[in-house]
Design a protein with these regions (language model features):
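ABC ATPase nucleotide-binding domains
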Residues: 236, 240-269
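ABC ATPase NBD coupling module
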Residues: 65-79, 89, 107-114
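Conserved ABC transporter NBD signature motif
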Residues: 57-65
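Helix-to-loop junction immediately C-terminal to a conserved catalytic motif
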Residues: 49
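The feature captures the beta-strand-to-loop junction immediately N-terminal to the Walker
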Residues: 34-36
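Conserved structural motif at the start of ABC-family nucleotide-binding domains
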Residues: 3, 18-20
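Conserved ABC ATPase "signature" region
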Residues: 111-129
Length: 269
């Protein structure tokens, strides 16, 4: 499974939001997309998903333009969690999550979808709320319920096979979570990659980005400013230029060589 952007651009309101972006997301890897507010991170992710039509260039899924793919194939190849995921008040959590597999796996029986939905709700820490209406949940619980729904979209497509799941595209998946739940969500992200699925996520906390990502893409003024492993990309020079951090806030672990930011709760928006 492969997902790649080729000279992709997007304009809105007479302003170019994403400039000529090219990048290949890798199966089995987590890619963190970081950058200051207004850099184009969410737009880039929406372009990769096909939720926004590209204003220039092309997006490929398995070397085929996504505009040429059937809805079922596209749904099974990538799934996106947006920051404004819709609420579906008339559904229980189990039914909401099960709906994630309707387009990507139309031949999967209803009972199998419901069983898989229950498993996913347990994974995101909502196993006790299977029959609950989503409107009765906190913001963090709703966010994890919708994470289970987009995971369902990919896992239903490969259910009962030895195939790897597709690409999870996650826009700020831990923004509404407390510290322990942030760790849970990012553990799920890593587990998805270990199964051979790809992950691209927009994240503001640089320390979490380094902790969970194999690759980092830095957006600045709508352009891909840097890309590569965290230890190569996240330097004091970059942090100062892109995020306005003070020189010396980026440190490196002696044992791993991975960078980290002090103070540890540094959020770069």
């Amino acid at each position: 499974m492969s997902l790649s952007l080729h000279n992709v651009g997007w304009c809105a309101g007479g302003k170019t939001i994403v400039h000529d972006a090219s990048y290949a997301f890798e199966a089995g890897k987590v890619t963190a997309i970081i950058g200051p507010n207004g850099a184009g991170k969410s737009t880039l992710l929406r372009l990769a998903s096909g939720l926004l039509p590209v204003g220039g260039g092309v997006v490929h899924l398995n070397n085929v333009p996504i505009s040429d793919l059937s809805p079922m194939y596209l749904a099974g190849g990538r799934a996106m969690l947006t920051q404004d995921s819709p609420l579906r008040a008339r559904f229980t959590l189990r039914d909401l999550v099960a709906m994630g597999g309707q387009v990507s796996a139309p031949l999967l029986g209803a009972s199998a979808r419901l069983e898989l939905a229950e498993q996913l709700l347990k994974r995101v820490g909502l196993g006790a709320f299977i029959e609950r209406d989503i409107m009765g949940l906190s913001g963090g619980e709703r966010q994890r319920a919708h994470l289970a729904r987009v995971m369902m979209q990919l896992e239903a497509a490969v259910h009962g096979t030895d195939k790897s799941p597709g690409f999870l595209l996650l826009d700020e998946p831990i923004s509404a979570q407390d510290l322990s739940r942030q760790s849970l969500v990012l553990d799920l992200v890593r587990a998805h990659a270990r199964r051979g699925g790809g992950v691209a996520l927009v994240i503001h906390d640089l320390n979490w980005a380094v902790a969970c990502a194999d690759q980092i893409v830095v957006l600045h003024d709508g352009r891909i400013y840097a890309q590569g492993p965290p230890e190569q990309v996240l330097t004091n020079a970059l942090a100062s230029h892109v995020f306005g951090l003070e020189e010396g806030q980026v440190h490196k672990h002696v044992a791993t060589g991975k960078p980290y930011i002090l103070p540890h709760n540094m959020i770069c928006q």
